Structures are given as C-alpha cells and as structure tokens.
A protein has these predicted regions:
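Short hydrophobic segments within beta-strands
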Residues: 30-32, 90, 136, 160
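Generic structural signal for residues in well-ordered beta-strands
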Residues: 54-58, 157, 216
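N-terminal ligand-binding/catalytic initiation module
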Residues: 1-78
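Glycine-rich phosphate/diphosphate-binding loop of Rossmann-like nucleotide-binding domains
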Residues: 37-46, 69, 107-189, 193, ...
C-alpha cells in the first residue's frame, strides 16, 4: 500500500487552522539560499508558506539575515551553516534542535523531516513501540534525529550508514518492521530485501520502488509535503 504525504499535511494544517487565521501573515521566515539550494525545495516552501499565510524573505548569509533583523531562519544552502547561533533556527540547525532530537522530543526545534516521518507513521497507524526499526543514514537533519525519535517511542533502533557492510545491512533490513531509507544511495535496497508487512519510508531514494507489495512511503509525494507543513507549524509556534 502506498502511503502518501498529502493527507497528513492537510490534517496538520487543519489542526493549526485557528493559529493560521490568528497569525495570518504576521510570522516571517527568512530563507538563506544561494546557487547550491534545491530549487524544487524552495518552490515547495513557497507554496506551503502561502497555505499557512507565512511571509518569506530571502538572504544570502546569516550575516545578511542578521542585518535584516531576522529572527526565524531556515538555511537551505549546501551545506548549511553548522550553527545558526543567535537565531530561532528551523530544522534543527542549532544546538537546541540537536538536544531536543537527542532526547526524542518533538517541538519547534525538531528537524522537520524526522518529525514528518513520525507523524506519517502515526497518521497511518503504523505501530512503533516494540518494533525493530532500521535507519539507513546518519545525517544531522534526518538519520540521527529520526533514530532518536523512534527510540523515544520505544522502537528498537539500528542505524546503518555508508560504511556498514552490505551483507550486514541486508540482514538487518530483512529483520526490520520499519526501514527508513535516508542515505541518498539510489537503489541500495529493493522489495526482495524486506519482509512482508514491513513499512519502508523512502526519504533519500535508497529504495527501488519497482514493487509495491508492502507499506511504502514513496520518495515522491511521501515525506516531502509533510516536511514543509511541519516547517510552517514550527514557524507559527
């Protein structure tokens, strides 16, 4: 079964409907971008900001954002600044966000994709507690915080990465109830690697989606719409 993100994003906007109306166009998000920024992601942020009635302004650096008097910032450069000190940084881009993710707490500092994954599992009633979750990838924005949020929900979590032996990886995936693919290695695993009833969250395109005989949150139309909705909910908060 394909589990799409749009219904989850719609439900989140409905949950915040009163906030959206009360704060209409009063919240400002400063987006720090340059030539390395993903244009598709920028467009998605723009569309979602309009739905949430959040104003967007743009800067090319944290220094410029500071001179503009920015308070809430999102750095979409590659790589982003290691620490947006002095700002209310979205997507876990400062120490506060990393600490909250480490203790498994979802709040306005939590990395958005990690929170989106948990929200999707909850929306589709995918059990987490007591399940074996394999997270492939250890990035600061997705892999690590997702692992900690799953752990906080009483999953047994294994983190794999680019240095994990391929044989060990396949063995772990075969025994998993939940697999989060977030390493960006296209085609790393496919349906032959997972067991019946497993839920695969294909964040980074690692999973070959040629077969749909399982619960699949797809690369396109999956976590992405929920991630931008979570981002805007953080701005309102």
């Amino acid at each position: 079964m394909i589990l799409y993100g749009k219904p989850v994003a719609d439900a989140l906007r409905e949950q915040y409907a009163e906030w959206i109306e009360a704060m209409a166009w009063k919240r400002i998000l400063t987006v720090i971008k340059d030539d390395t920024s993903d244009k598709g992601y920028l467009a998605a942020i723009q569309r979602e900001a309009e739905r949430w009635q959040v104003r967007l302004v743009y800067a090319e650096s944290l220094l410029q954002a500071g001179r503009m008097g920015a308070f809430t910032v999102l750095d979409v450069r590659k790589p982003p600044a290691s620490d947006a000190f002095g700002f209310f940084a979205m997507d876990g881009q400062n120490d506060a966000g990393r600490v909250k993710a480490y203790v498994g707490e979802m709040c306005e500092y939590t990395p958005c994709t990690a929170e989106a994954i948990i929200r999707m599992l909850d929306y589709y009633n995918i059990p987490i507690a007591g399940k074996h979750a394999v997270v492939i990838g250890r990035s600061e924005r997705v892999g690590k915080p997702t692992a900690m949020l799953l752990l906080a929900r009483d999953a047994t979590v294994t983190v794999c990465h680019s240095k994990t032996d391929k044989g060990d990886l396949l063995e772990l995936v075969a025994g998993a109830d939940i697999v989060v693919c977030a390493s960006g290695q296209k085609g790393l695993i496919d349906w032959t690697c997972v067991t019946h009833g497993c839920t695969v969250i294909n964040v980074g395109g690692d999973y070959d989606e040629c077969d749909m005989r399982l619960n699949l949150i797809p690369f396109k139309g999956g976590v992405g719409p929920v991630t931008t909705a979570v981002l805007m909910s953080h701005v309102l908060m």
